[in-house]
A protein has these predicted regions:
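Catalytic Walker B motif of ABC-type/P-loop ATPase nucleotide-binding domains
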Residues: 155-158
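Conserved ABC transporter NBD signature motif
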Residues: 58-69
Length: 237
C-alpha cells in the first residue's frame, strides 16, 4: 500500500489553477524528486500534502501507517527565519510539538531523540549556540534535525540546498541520502536535475510537461527530448 497517494489534484490560488489533474503515489522507501519550472507549483504541492493548503479538486490520502501529522518538513527559509533568536537545541526539539498535544513539556525520550538527531546531523556541539549565528549549511542541518524529530517515516524537503556552496551542498545531499538508506521516504523539491537523477528513485516533473515515474524512465524521456505524461497515477517503474 502506498504511503502517500495524490489523486486528480488541482491546485491554485484565488481561483487560478497552477496544477491541474495531477496524480501520483509514493511508496515506503521511495526517494521522489519534484522538479519543474519556477512558478509551476512545486512548493504549493508540498504544502498541500502537509495540509497547509487545500486542493481545489482531488484528494490526498496516506497509508501504510503514515499519518499526515507524522511527516517531517524542511521548508524554504525566509530572511526572518534565518535570524530567529533561539538556540539550536530549542529549534530541534520543537519538531516534537505536533506530538505534544496539550502537555506543556517534552518527555525524557523526546529530549533523548532530539540529541540523537543532532548527533546524526553533526550539530550536537552547536546545541547551545544561537541559531542566527550559524552558517547557512549549519542552519539547514538544524532544520533537518528538527524535521527528523517529527517523523521516522517521511521527510518533505523544499530546496534544502538552496544558497549553499558546492561543498556544503554535497554534504547535505550525502546526509539526506543516508537517511533514505536508513528507511526514511524522501520527497524533495530541487532545481538540480543532476542531483535528482543521482539520488532519487522517482521523478515528478510538473509544469508545461508532466511526468511521474522512475528516474530511469525519466532519463530515457530526456534523451528522446520529451517527457511522458502521467495518467491516472500510474507508476512507471
Amino acid at each position: 500500500m502506498a504511503q502517500l497517494t495524490c489523486e486528480n489534484l488541482t491546485l491554485g490560488y484565488e481561483g487560478r489553477e497552477i496544477i491541474s489533474d495531477l496524480s501520483f503515489s509514493v511508496n515506503s522507501g521511495d526517494y521522489l524528486c519534484i522538479v519543474g519550472e519556477n512558478g509551476s507549483g512545486k512548493s504549493t504541492l508540498m504544502k498541500t500534502i502537509l495540509g497547509l493548503h487545500s486542493p481545489m479538486k482531488g484528494k490526498i490520502t496516506t497509508g501504510d501507517g503514515l499519518k499526515q501529522t507524522e511527516i517531517g518538513y524542511l521548508p524554504q527559509q525566509t530572511l526572518v527565519q534565518k535570524d530567529f533568536p533561539a538556540s539550536v537545541r530549542e529549534i530541534v526539539i520543537s519538531g516534537f510539538q505536533g506530538k505534544c498535544g496539550l502537555r506543556p513539556f517534552y518527555t525524557k525520550e523526546e529530549k533523548r531523540q532530539a540529541l540523537e538527531n543532532m548527533k546524526k546531523m553533526r550539530i550536537d556541539d552547536l546545541q547551545k549556540r544561537c541559531y542566527r549565528e550559524l552558517s547557512g549549511g549549519q542552519q539547514q542541518r538544524v532544520l533537518l534535525a528538527r524535521a527528523l524529530c517529527a517523523t521516522k517515516s517521511m521527510l518533505l524537503l523544499d530546496e534544502p540546498v538552496a544558497g549553499l556552496d558546492p561543498r556544503v551542498t554535497a554534504e547535505m545531499y550525502s546526509m539526506i541520502s543516508q537517511l533514505h538508506k536508513e528507511g526514511i521516504t524522501v520527497i524533495m523539491i530541487s532545481h538540480d536535475i543532476e542531483a535528482a537523477l543521482r539520488y532519487a528513485t522517482h521523478i515528478l516533473h510538473i509544469g508545461r510537461e508532466v511526468f511521474f515515474g522512475s528516474k530511469e524512465t525519466f532519463k530515457r524521456g530526456m534523451f528522446l527530448g520529451s517527457y511522458s505524461a502521467v495518467t491516472g497515477g500510474e507508476r512507471n517503474g
